[in-house]
Each structure stands twice: as C-alpha cells, then as structure tokens.
Amino acid sequence: MPAIGIDLGTTYSCVGVFQYGKVEIIANDQGNRTTPSYVAFTDSERLIGDAAKNQVAMNPKNSVFDAKRLIGRRFDDSKIQEDIKHWPFKVINDNGKPKISVEFKGANKCFSPEEISSMVLTKMKETAEAYLGTTVKDAVITVPAYFNDSQRQATKDAGAIAGINVLRIINEPTAAALAYGLDKNLKGERNVLIFDLGGGTFDVSILTIDEGSLFEVRSTAGDTHLGGEDFDNRLVNHFAEEFKRKYKKDLRSNPRALRRLRTAAERAKRTLSSSTEASLEIDALYEGHDFYSKVSRARFEELCGDLFRNTLEPVEKALKDAKMDKSQIHDIVLVGGSTRIPKVQNLLQNFFGGKTLNLSINPDEAVAYGAAIQAAILSGDKSSEIKDVLLVDVAPLSLGIETAGGVMTKLIERNSRIPCKQSKTFTTYADNQPAVTIQVFEGERALTKDNNVLGTFDLTGVPPAPRGVPKIDVTFDLDANGILNVTAKEQGTGNAKNITIKNDKGRLSQADIDRMLSEAEKYAEEDERHRQRIAARNQLETYLFGVKEAAENGGDRISAADKSSIVERCSEAMKWLDSNTTAEKEEYEYKLKELEQFCSPIMTKMHKGGGDGQQAPNFGQQAGGYKGPTVEEVD
C-alpha cells in the first residue's frame, strides 16, 4: 500500500505518489493536477474542490476557503480579524477558537478549520486512491516552514479527522528542495535558497544539498500570512473604489458582487504575469451596473509594492541566520504560484545582484513532489533513486520557559536541527516553595509576554528548602514533526512531570478528533447517498427520453394508440421528475420499474413488428440486467 505526499495549500492542494522509481503528480476527477482548497455546502450536498469553487458566486456565504489562514490560530489574532473583512463566509468565536458557520441542508452548522482542512485532505486522498486503485492510509503532509507548534498540531489533527495516518509533517520549502535536488541530479555541495510564495503563506529556506542526497536545512524565515490572496485583496479594493467613483455605490456590502469581482481580479492578476495590461468585463455586477475596467502591470505593482518589497526581509534574515553571504548561494529556486509575478522575480534578482533565478521546477507541484519522496522514504521504499536521501530540518522558532521577571530563557534556539533534545537546570525563587510552574513559550523576544505561550504545567512535591537549593532539570524534546515534548524533574526526589505541548487553548482533544472523524464518515456516507440518488435520477431520465424517442420515431412499427400512451406516460413521468427534484434513490428506482413494466411490452411488440432483426433499444436497466454504464456526468 503506497504512501502519498499531500501539499495542503491555502488556495490549491496537490497530491503525489512515488512509484516505479519516479514521482507521479495525480490529476483529480476534472483532470486538474491541483485542486482548489474549497468546501461548499448547499441545500442538498457538500462539494469539495473544483465543484465547490465553480459555484462560489451563487453561494458565497456557504463556500469556505482559506482554512489554512485560520488553522491553529486564536479568534482574536489580528491577522484573522483583518481577514474576516474579506471573507464572505461567517467566522464566529467559540471559546477563543475561530469556527466557520454555514447553512447546510437547511440547518446551521459550525465547523472548525481542522474539519474543513480534513475535507480537502479527504478529497486529495480519494484522488490518489482512484489513480492507484487501492485504499491509502499513510501520508506526509506539508506545512509552511514558519508554521508554529499549534498550527502544526492542528494540521496533524486535520489528517487524523480525514482518516489519514500522518507519517510526518514536513516543511514546504524543504519538500521543494527535495524535488529540486532529486530532479536535477545535483553534483557536489550546493547552497540552495528556496523562495516559496504561495496563495496565503511565504517561506524562505536555505539548504545545503550534498551530492543530491544529503539535504541540510541551514535556516528558515517567512510570513505565515503573505501570499497571492493579499495581492488579490489590493486589486479588489482598487476596483471597488473605482466602481464607487463611477456609480456612487459600494458593492462591498454584497457578497455575490464581491465574489464575482474577486474572481475577475484574480484572473487579471494572472494575466498581468504575461501581459502588461489586463481588462475586466463583468456584466450586471451590482444593482444592474456593468463594470468594464483595465489595469496595467505598473498599476498592480504600485498597489502591491510594499507587499512585494516585504518578501526580501525574510531573505535577509535567512541569510543572516545561515551565516551566509548573498554570493554563497548557488541556486535560487522559485516555488508557489505567486513567484510567477514579474516584479517579485525582478526584486529578488536585483537583491542577488542580477543572478539568474532557477525556474526549472513546476512551482505548483514541487512541494507535493517532495512530500511524495519523503512519504516513500518513511514507508520503507528502498528504490535506488531515494535510498541515500537524508533530510535534516530545523526548528523555525526558539523554544524556552519563563523565568523570574517574565524573562524568556531559551532551551532550543531557532534553526536548531530537528529532532533535538536540550536540558537546563533551574531552581526555586522563594524559600520552601512546594511547587514550580513551568510555562513554555515560542518566539524570539526577550520577554515572554511578547512571545507565544504553548502550554503550562506544575511540578509539585518539591521538598521544602531555602530558595536556590532544589534543582529542577527541564528537558525539551522536539520531534521530527516539529512538535514539542517537555519534561521537568526534581533531582532530589526524582519527581517528574511531562507534557506534549498540545496548546490546549487552541487544540482539539482526542474526543473532539474522534467525534469529527465519525462526523466525517457520516458526511462521506451522505455524499455517497447523494451520488446514488443522482445516478438513479439520471437512469430514469435516460430511459424516459430513450423510450419516448423510440416511440416517436417508430413509424409504422408501432400503433398510434401505443405511441400516444407511451408519450403520455413519459410526459407524466417528466412532470413528476420536475416536481420531485429531491426524491430519494428508491423513489426514482420504483418509478423506473413502473415505467419499464408499462413500456417494455410495447417496445418488444414494436421491435417484433419491425421484423428487421435489429436489437431492441436497451434503455436504463431492462430485464436481462443491463451491464453498461447507465449514469451520465452531472455538473
């Protein structure tokens, strides 16, 4: 059973598998090699991927995207508060966690970002299963290198809800470097800078690749909230202001108009990567007003200038952390759809003194490609192409505990190799202190109040002694997924306590995950029932039209009375179909059976009357158990 690699993106996701010595990027049921990270809820069904994105203008409030911008964050996070202004769906505060509120089958439902992401993961898993012809359990899932502990944990939870055994969470730029290193058969030792600008996140990683098989991450930097969508927002605001000037109306209050404008703005942005001007034509955009406009590449670059320039800061930081000079970088590899923007390439190239950028890997697929390689390695694939590959990654943020005065005392420095283990000895702050509170933080600031708290626990049973006497060993153990385990042990008594940082404020409990997993199975069953219903309806329709057409074109092989009774019966059935669009599968099947019982004798008679030895038309499923496909595709 092969293991797969999934690039779970903000706007698009991609899945690959390593087999027969090479990686296959797998196309979905629409033939697309990337799938929109969209989930939509309607009165009758749940849609995921292309089908969800295609109906978004008709159903903006119940079409959910950008779950990756919500995952592992608190509701009051300033980035989320900023995003809420742009999202057509409703985000609510559930005990400090953001939840997405939608209307599904006529009822209000709330989903956590993990559940929405799990639905996208399920879609990617099913895409792989359809291609491989077998069930898939194991996967490597990628996250931005700059994701913190709670965002990584939440992504792992999303995998669990999707019924996936997550072999490892790996960093996107590291996965892209794997793809680059193995695809290019690199010789010698090369310093490679991966510049990964996607739909919602931005990462820079510097790796040393030795002989194309040892991949050592030297440093990583980035912004988990910068990407193509931020450029779209700037364009949308620009056009909305223009509309307001022209028509004295603000379309931003209307989710449908805003969505149509966003789709057109995104298309214009893509056009501007290859042309110097893009035009927008949207009929009846808002209150009957057509909106026709143009935007030049120069104008777009001015609108997003500060965001584009911001991408260079993490590049400088990564170089500094890796203790490297610009001239020491051999290859600059571009990953993520937003690196197609000419201005982004131009700024980066100028930063490196005109050095040619490497555009040789597919920016949309490189991350899934690398994840598929890592999945094969972790599942024990011994193929010659990957048997020597060794990947050494790093921690994106420093980890430490709070000591007297609210000071952040670091145990693991950022860019330390992972997995890693570090210990330090601490003591009590007051005489006869019976317990110590260990507060764990991540971040780079000197005071803990400016960093992100990961968890807290108490070590009790410290024997009474003057301050400074008891010795408490604190050990940080950071695993290969970048997830932290903390142990505190009192030397005198051997008393110990440990926690895996599960960021309880933002994390799902095991019970939550189990509940969501069973709900996910229930939704999958409902989806299957819905598919069967549509199939039964199509079967009935196909039979209806077929019989009606055969009767009408039967000529003298069918009597006028038989013909009119068939046409009448078919018209009745069509009316029934139109007024029973939400009938159950069994009702459609019963109706088909009824119709067959009535029409089959006449059809047989007509066929015999024809006497030309032709085969009777086989509609739907007539007696004799018709084996061919009886279902047509429905959009």
Swiss-Prot record:
GO terms for biological process: chaperone cofactor-dependent protein refolding; determination of adult lifespan; protein refolding; response to starvation. The modification Phosphothreonine is found at residue 127. Signal peptide: none annotated. Residues 606-635 are annotated as: Disordered. GO terms for molecular function: ATP binding; ATP hydrolysis activity; ATP-dependent protein folding chaperone; heat shock protein binding; protein folding chaperone. Gene3D superfamilies: 1.20.1270.10, 3.30.30.30, 3.30.420.40, Actin, Chain A, domain 4 (3.90.640.10), Substrate Binding Domain Of DNAk, Chain A, domain 1 (2.60.34.10). It holds the Pfam family HSP70. Transmembrane segments: none annotated. GO terms for cellular component: cytoplasm; cytosol; nucleus; plasma membrane. The keyword Phosphoprotein applies. Keywords: ATP-binding, Nucleotide-binding, Phosphoprotein, Stress response. SUPFAM superfamilies: Actin-like ATPase domain, Heat shock protein 70kD (HSP70), C-terminal subdomain, Heat shock protein 70kD (HSP70), peptide-binding domain. Belongs to the heat shock protein 70 family. PANTHER family: HEAT SHOCK PROTEIN 70KDA. This is Heat shock protein 68. It comes from Drosophila melanogaster. The gene is Hsp68.
